[in-house]
Structure formats: structure tokens, C-alpha cells
Amino acid sequence: MARKHIFIGCGGAGSKTVALIKMKVYESLQNVSGNRSKVDVMNDNYRFMFIDTDAGDIDNLNEKFRTKYENGRVKMLSTNELINLGTQNPYVIYQKAKAAQEIQINKRIIEACDDEVAMHMDNRALKFGAGAFRLKSRTAFARLADQFCEKLVKNIQDLNKIEDNAADNNTVCYWVVCSSLGGTGS
């Protein structure tokens, strides 16, 4: 039975922790030979996902590991692994949800965030973070939940496609790393 792993980092603290785990897994791979890179070998058993609002934090992590990860040829945190909540404007999302309350996800947004709370949201995208305001990132995540699900399903399918292991024999372990005090990760 093959054990496969999907690590999901939520918010700044979660993303930093999962990035460190990814680097440890990468560095632990020894004696990689043939035409496969360490990343190829790592991808046989591991997938990593990052959910964050602060693009600067993601850029800083890529810069921190730039010389250690594939000698800088590829970014350590790729766009395929990132759910970028920083592109979303929670204030606008809430207003659109109020205008179309018959849609299920909009009902959930309105249930989670009442008018009084929504009035305190800035009318801007979250590219500089959620500012420890949990409902900002949760509202943004609601809009990108389908994208998250698609990436998660693709990761599961890719891990089960590895030819030397039958999918029936794989056990996929999910590791979600987040914080309890911030905005996006809590």
C-alpha cells in the first residue's frame, strides 16, 4: 500500500509551514537518477496547496528558497499550487451575494457575514492580506471554493495515476495547516 500526502497551507502561517515541509521533503530526496528531477520524484507521493491573500508573502517564500529549490529554475510555490484569495474583493462579493440570494453559496456568505460586519470591510482586493479579519478571507474563499475543489481533485487523481502503484492500494493522507489567530488561516 502506497501512502500519498497532500499538504494544504491556509493563510500566512499555514503557507509558511507547508513551504518548510515541502522544502524538507525535497531536501530528503537522495540519489535521484535518470532524467527525473527531485521534483518529479517528490510528485510521486506528495502534493502541496497554498491558500493565501498576501501575494507578498508568497513572493517572499519563493525568494527565500529560490537558490535551494531546483537551483532557481522553477518557483517553489507554483501558481498551480496556489489559491490566490488576494485577487478577491470581499466587499463586492458580499454586495453581489445580497443581490442574488437565491444562489446557495450566496446564502452561506450572507449567513456568515451580516450587514454590520460587511460595512467594516474595505472596498478593495485582499492582495495585502486579510488583516486578521476572518470574514474577509472566508468570503473570498467562498468565491474560489470551486477552484480549490478542482485543484484538490486533480491532486488526488494525479497521485493515483502513478503507474507503479494501483490506485486501489493508495492511501491519501491530508494535512491541513492553519493558524487560530490570523485572518486567512483561522
What are the language-model segments listed below?
Residues M1-C178, S186:
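Segments that form or flank anion-binding pockets
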